[in-house]
Each structure stands twice: as C-alpha cells, then as structure tokens.
C-alpha cells in the first residue's frame, strides 16, 4: 500500500460510529465516462488487438447515452446518498467473504517478528505473557477511544484517516458459510465484553481468563496461567483431536464440518468460547528447520502442515499471535476486518510495549488464587474424524505447493530513490513490472492496494501498475537489439514513474476504476435478469485475474509482512522499503511451471541495478532528477476519455 501512516500526538480518535466521525467525506463515485476510458486504457496493451476491439465495442454500448451504464451509475449515486460507504459491502463480499479458498496462504497474511532467543519454555511463556499484557493495554486504549488518529503520508500527506478498522482488531470473527462467509462483530448489548484469550498448545485449545473478579491479570499471573496450560497440554491421556485443522480447509468444507460439530452441545460451547475471544495465542513447538526469514515466514503462513504447527491455529479469528519455542514469533491475520497498515500499527504498538515492560522481571504471583485455565472439549463423531483427515491432507497440499522466498535488496533503499525526487513506491512498482517482463515477456493485470481511508469507512482500491508507460519502458530496457540511447530510456523511466504516481493519486482520492466497476457490476446483478456483457467479457474477467498481487507494508521496527498469490499462475509481492534496503516477500505456486519465486527475486534485483544505472545519468548532467511530484495532475484530469 503506497500510503504510510503515522499517528501525530494530541489527536484522539473518536468512536467508529458514523455520527461520531463527521469530519471525513463520503467516498465519491467517479464519472462513468472517465472510468470506462481508464479501463480501456489499462487493458488495451494487455490483450490481443482483436479481443480489445470487441471489448471496446462492448464498453461503448454499455456507456452509450441513455444506456445501461448511465442507469446503473444513477443507482450508484443514489446508493452513495443512502449508505455510509457505497462500496464497502460489495468490496468485502467480493474480496473476502465470497471467496471459497482456504484461508492459509490464499487469504491470511502474516507478520513475522524479529527472531527471539528463548533459553527454555519459561522464556517462551514470559514473552507470551508480555504480549498478552500488551494486547490488553492496547485493547483498553481502543475501548476508551484513546488511540490517536492516523494521518496520511506519501502522496497528499497530512489528511486524517478513518479509524473504523482498528475497532475490528479484537472484536471480529469470520464465520464460515456454505456459499458466503459472515464477518461477525462482537458488539452486543446482551453478551458481555470478551474477557478471555484462547491459547493453542499441542493442537489443544484453552480458555485463559484475563479478567478474574473484575481484576485484569498481571503479567506474572498470565505467566502462571500459561505454565498451567503447557502442563495440561502435555498430558497425552487428555489430548483431543486437532479440531483447528477444520478451519484451514476450504470455506464451504469448513461450513459443512461446523454444521456437523454444532449438533453436539459440548462442541457448541467450545466454538462459542473461541468465537467470542479477544484473540488467539499459539504456543508453537519447534519447527525443526533452520530459522531463516523464509522458514519463519512459512511457519506463520501455514504452520508447516498438520505434522508441525498447522493444526495449532484457528484461522477464523482475526488475530493469532504465534510464540514458538524456537523463537519464531509473529501474528497471523484473518484479513477481512482490517488492512495491513492497521495490523502493522497495532503490532508495532505491542512490540514497543513489550520492549518497555520486558525490562521488569516477571515472577509468578497469586498462584493459589487463580482458577486453572479450562481445556475446550470436543465430541468427535466418525464423520468429524473423516473430515479432519481430509482437512489435514489438503493443508499438506497447501504446504507443498507454496514457493516462497524472503529477499533483501541491500544495494540501496528509499533514501537513494527519494534523492531522485520521486516516490519510492512508484519506483519499486516500475521495478516489479520490469522484473515480470524479464521473466515472462509480457505485462499482466497488477494489483497494488491503495488506502482510501481518507473517506468514511474507506478500505482500499487498486492501483493498476501495468501502465502503457511501464510497458514502453520495460520493452526498451529488455530489447538488446535496440540502439536506443540510455538518455531516452531514462525519459521512459520517468514517464513510467510519473504514470504510476498519477494513478496512485487517482486511487487514494477515490477516482480509480476497480471499486467503481465492482459497484456497477453488483447493481447490475440486482436490476438485470442476467449480468450484462460488459461484465462477462473476457477482457473484464482477465482484468480481475491479478497475476501480480503487490502491496507496500512498511514498518519502523524489525518485522515484515507476507502473503500468498491470488491466482494459480500468479505472484504475491509484499515489500518493505527501508532507508538503505528493500525487503521483498515473493510467493508463487510450485504447481505452476511458469513461475519461480527465486527467479522473480533475482529479476527484481537486476531491475533495481539497471534502474540505478539510468538514474546515474541524471546525476551526471544528462538530465534533472526523476522529478514526478510537480507533474502529478489532479485526478479529474487523469485518463479523461
């Protein structure tokens, strides 16, 4: 995501309710003709000429005066008037809740902390107790609406951002459905606020009450209770089947299994405790591998499968903090309630809390007063046993299929890029396009998440980074038979960065095309007997198959974010620009013979080196630095038909 956020002091956030956040504007609806023209411009160079001509005719018919497009646009404007955010429900369903794929790798990103060095299990549990204490402190800030308001950085910096997502961090649960999941927010006048954490250990689940007799447990108390949980979990006579595996299955399969589970009251009670918890803390066994960044990330993404820590999870819960005995720590995130930047802000707050409080010695206290944590019980019929075996097998396939690498480019970082007077994010995106073209000889529809939190209840829209200008640049760079001088290649690089920056501004100001086309499509489902050709056309379908799925997730502390590809023949590319380096997490699938994460990482490296070489021309008097900011046009002027 190209927008970095930081929290300026003395601006207290208000409640997420619409009546208490009047300062933010509603998300605008872009002009219809602007979106249609931009859509054609985004796709023309990515599809065969004949296919494009057919699509162009379909788009012209859709957007004709008095046609279906204008009717749907009017309905969208009415929806904007009547709702807090006209796209949020459509977007949530399309991006997450309708998706039937398993959550590990396919949907749930992970944040990996710096490797810890635990001398023994007590060290591991002290870290976990410290972390839980930090969660409770942060949740108290949320509950009192005391966290500062985020402000945008990067393009159009300084504007306040919507804070609603923060209030879903500890109160959300993704309930599986047969055709569509439900995002449940634990706000109820009937049920009390959750006052427990679920601890996963040895694939067993335990209720850790964090408030007892109206008193929040101290870090020492939490440590005491965690020691009890480890002892209980190690009793093999008491061990129950690894029910958490079911949550790693496809969403429809898990919904089916849950229907079977809830027939028994014991299972219903256990599910209720998990669904209403603040968060999960997963006490992992050692992964048994060298603790490289790549291997630690894999432990967070899928747990290494059912034979390692893959069943020591409950993927429906929005936050699962992993504390491994081998020092592998981080958080697995169910993505539907909030975006990556919000997760990072929360996590950095927790880590800062932990650094401060870890200087104090944690001793067990109040031992005799604390009731023992409760093991969650499960009644497993032969049918459930069969479903568990099936889930385990499918998780193993996910583990085997993921091709993943963490790559650190350390020749330069965002300091050098800023010296070129251009956006680091735009520069990196152009490098990713060049890397893909080097490997595959073409550009493809690319997704880069762009925050629209400047608007009320805003989440993200898409920056389509595979611009015509990027194609001109990558062709020039890779055409070794061409006699094009480097000075002209430099101009093409400037053009590509400028186009990327323009599209970024368009996206963050609510003028991009993806959400708009989604809104028109979903309204068409409601008013038309069948979906219009505009949305069944191969070009439109292809435009939504993001072979390159990218996101900038910057951090100020030692940690990084990663996720999997979103299509079988695609790449996930999450990057974290630092002053003197850029960290990439590249993912793809072994099942696709065309893709390779290590080759892609190598191509990224080559692209950065070549682009730096062109930049040196600028510094040697052949041109000005790659200034882009002053040439950014306002969104309403970009890609006009």
Curated annotation (Swiss-Prot):
The modification Phosphoserine is found at residues 17, 366. It comes from the Eukaryota. The keyword Transferase applies. This is Choline O-acetyltransferase. GO terms for molecular function: choline O-acetyltransferase activity. Catalyzes the reversible synthesis of acetylcholine (ACh) from acetyl CoA and choline at cholinergic synapses. Transmembrane segments: none annotated. Its EC number is 2.3.1.6. Gene3D superfamilies: Chloramphenicol acetyltransferase-like domain (3.30.559.10), Choline/Carnitine o-acyltransferase, domain 2 (3.30.559.70). It comes from Sus scrofa. InterPro entries: Carn_acyl_trans, CAT-like_dom_sf, Cho/carn_acyl_trans, Cho/carn_acyl_trans_2. GO terms for cellular component: cytoplasm; neuron projection; synapse. Residues 1-29, 619-641 are annotated as: Disordered. One of its GO terms (biological process) is acetylcholine biosynthetic process. Keywords: Acyltransferase, Neurotransmitter biosynthesis, Phosphoprotein, Transferase. The active site is at residue 335. It catalyses: choline + acetyl-CoA = acetylcholine + CoA. Disulfide bonds: none annotated.
């Amino acid at each position: 995501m190209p927008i970095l956020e930081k929290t300026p002091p003395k601006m207290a956030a208000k409640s997420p309710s619409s009546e208490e956040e009047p300062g933010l504007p509603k998300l605008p609806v872009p002009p219809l003709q602007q979106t249609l023209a931009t859509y054609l411009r985004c796709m023309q160079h990515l599809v065969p000429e004949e296919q494009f001509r057919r699509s162009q005719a379909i788009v012209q018919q859709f957007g004709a005066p008095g046609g279906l497009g204008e009717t749907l646009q009017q309905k969208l404007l009415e929806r904007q008037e009547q709702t807090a955010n006209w796209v949020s429900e459509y977007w949530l369903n399309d991006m997450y809740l309708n998706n039937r794929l398993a959550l590990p790798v396919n949907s749930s990103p992970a944040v990996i902390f710096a490797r810890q060095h635990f001398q023994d299990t007590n060290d591991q549990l002290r870290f976990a107790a410290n972390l839980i204490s930090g969660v409770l402190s942060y949740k108290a800030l949320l509950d009192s609406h005391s966290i500062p308001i985020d402000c945008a950085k990067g393009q159009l910096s300084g504007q306040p951002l919507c804070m609603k997502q923060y209030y879903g961090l500890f109160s959300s649960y993704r309930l599986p459905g047969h055709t569509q999941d439900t995002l449940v927010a634990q706000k109820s006048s009937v049920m009390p606020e959750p006052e427990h954490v679920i601890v996963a250990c040895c694939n067993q689940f335990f209720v850790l009450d964090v408030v007892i007799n109206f008193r929040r447990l101290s870090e020492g108390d939490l440590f005491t209770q965690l020691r009890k949980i480890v002892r209980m979990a190690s009793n093999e006579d008491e061990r129950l089947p690894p029910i958490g595996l079911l949550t790693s299955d496809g969403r429809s399969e898990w919904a089916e299994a849950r229907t079977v589970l809830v027939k028994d009251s014991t299972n219903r009670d256990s599910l209720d405790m998990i669904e209403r918890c603040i968060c999960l803390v997963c006490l992992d066994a050692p992964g048994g591998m060298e603790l490289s960044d790549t291997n630690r990330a894999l432990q967070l993404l899928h747990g290494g499968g059912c034979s390692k820590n893959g069943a020591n999870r409950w993927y429906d819960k929005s936050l699962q903090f992993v504390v491994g005995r081998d020092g592998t720590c981080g958080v697995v995130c169910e993505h539907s309630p909030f975006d990556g930047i919000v997760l990072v802000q929360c996590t950095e707050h927790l880590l800062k809390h932990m650094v401060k409080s870890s200087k104090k010695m944690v001793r067990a206290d109040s031992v005799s007063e604390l009731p023992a944590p409760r093991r969650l019980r499960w009644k497993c019929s032969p049918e459930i046993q069969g479903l568990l075996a099936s889930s385990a097998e499918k998780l193993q396939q996910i583990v085997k299929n993921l091709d993943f690498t963490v790559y650190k480019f350390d020749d330069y970082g965002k300091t050098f890029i800023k010296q070129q007077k251009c956006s680091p994010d735009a520069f990196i995106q152009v490098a990713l396009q060049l890397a893909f073209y080097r490997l595959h000889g073409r550009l493809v529809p690319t997704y880069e998440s762009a925050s629209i939190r400047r608007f009320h209840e805003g989440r993200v829209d898409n920056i389509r980074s595979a611009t015509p200008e990027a194609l001109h640049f990558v062709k020039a760079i890779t055409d070794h038979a061409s006699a094009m001088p480097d000075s002209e290649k430099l101009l093409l690089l400037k053009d590509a960065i400028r186009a990327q920056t323009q599209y970024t501004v368009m996206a963050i100001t609510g003028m991009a095309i993806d959400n708009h086309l989604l809104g028109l499509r979903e309204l068409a489902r409601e008013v038309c007997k069948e979906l219009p050709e505009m949305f069944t056309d191969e070009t439109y379908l292809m435009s939504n198959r993001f072979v390159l799925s990218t996101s900038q997730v910057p951090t100020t502390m030692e940690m990084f974010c990663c996720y999997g590809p979103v299509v079988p023949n695609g790449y996930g590319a999450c990057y974290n620009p630092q002053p003197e380096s850029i960290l990439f997490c590249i993912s793809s699938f072994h099942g696709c013979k065309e893709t390779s994460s290590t080759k892609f990482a190598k191509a990224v490296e080559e692209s950065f080196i070549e682009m730096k070489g062109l930049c040196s021309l600028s510094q040697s008097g052949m041109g000005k630095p790659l200034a882009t900011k002053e040439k950014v046009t306002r969104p309403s002027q970009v890609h006009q038909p």
